[in-house]
């Protein structure tokens, strides 16, 4: 197999034709995805707050950037075409009470189109959970065959199933027969280099009536190490007629366009780069528009002020979702009130944890960001986290509005194993 177009994409971009771009749209079954960009499902990340935040960030134009791109990009072409939920256990979902399911299946109307991702190994249980997702109004349902986490693989879920193609076929057939909405699968190359099954699996998916496939171009054994092997995305694209979504090592707009040019995939899926650079979907649209218009791709890079605005926006969304209720925090007398108080306090702790996590990601690549991250992790309350962030950006010379492009950071490579 030919060597892939390796991702020193800024160099490769100079040699790409002016027409090279991420497709404007694709259709998965009857669902229109425009543009052809997908936010990857990530455990502990892609809850409803983050998904809506990404949708907003994708349409956000840095007001103060000295390099504001003047190419026209509509809201639609500047957004993320498809978002996906955190992966959800089919076994757990099928056994949950209706009230508890809401935690995993909550979404808002402005999130459409949205796909619910499931993992598991029992065809009947997965089919039952797919029906639950369809009834909840999701536009698509997706099967996770990519998660490399030991706890998931131990249950024969995620990438663990890549060693059992007959079971995968049974799952494909049972789920496909159970739901009318588009059914897709996200998978890896195979278990290891001696067991690469991606082409065979993609053909099986097509034969079983699935509507699209998404390939993370690494094996389970690789985890996130080494380079994604885009040549296998090209091989899958050559093997099937259903849409193929490419995933792996897309950190910049140049990477996204280079992947499409090298593999002819129908869409790109972005995972770990999105929490660190929420602007990436809009940047892809800007890069494509300017490349078509002038032959040279350009895009806005966030300033310090832009980063501060986005951190503030995320925190506001997070706290709105937690929905503070001061009366619950007062004296609790009944058992029901005590349960409500415990649940609320737990939600507050979770919100503060997420604030720390995302503030850390958003400040990677910013000079002095390491100091801020240390201060953030010492904070005990959400208000303290925001005070640290505000003080940091106030101290910097924001009047200069220097652009702060995201730098490649080793900590982003150490992503949670459950991100698939």
Name each region found by the language model.
Residues 1-33, 37, 43, 64, ...:
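Alpha/beta catalytic cores of nucleotide-metabolism and tRNA/nucleoside-modifying enzymes
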Residues 15-27, 42-132:
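Glycine-rich, positively charged N-terminal anion/phosphate-binding segment
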Residues 33-36, 91-114, 147, 152-155, ...:
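N-terminal small/glycine-rich loop or linker at the start of catalytic domains
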Residues 105-111, 132-137, 176-177, 203-207:
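Acidic (Asp/Glu)-rich catalytic clusters
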Residues 115-138, 160-167, 196:
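Glycine-rich anion/phosphate-binding loops
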